[in-house]
Amino acid sequence: METKRKLLNHFLAALAYRTQKALRGAPEDFGSFHVMDGVRTPAELVRHMTSVLGYARTHFVGGRYWPETLESFQEEIERFHEMLGLLAQHLRNGDTLLEGMSEERLLQGPFSDAMTHAGQLALLRRLAGAPVPPENFIVANIEPDRLGPDQAAPASPDKDWPEAPPDWTP
């Protein structure tokens, strides 16, 4: 696989990891957590992440992608990970990008957009009263073939967490 595509594939794996990091251990009702009008719920964010990645996929296959609302947050999460797998397959296969699209534009557009929303999920966890424990992502066990919801446990969780909830233990 060409170098740029390897990097994009790794980026998708990092996106899978960071998204699951933000979702792992979330309260049961987190998908419907509502901060205020005009702010997406976690379920809406995951659907939007799938949408922007589906848009990226149209630059391989053509057409449009507009995901329907699914019944559960878990289904939204599963569809998101399926979309990561579909995109990664196009990258691995060396599929041609449609005219006017490049690997750099995929990164600066939909891929980066989706990563931004993974960070928003982590922020919503804090606002929901269930913050995400910190870790050193440089040493995270991120594998390009691991794009599903079953992600590795933190390789280097932080032992010190000044903003930790009172009941947190490392």
Where are these regions (language model features)?
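Helix-adjacent hinge/juxtasegments
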Residues: 58-97
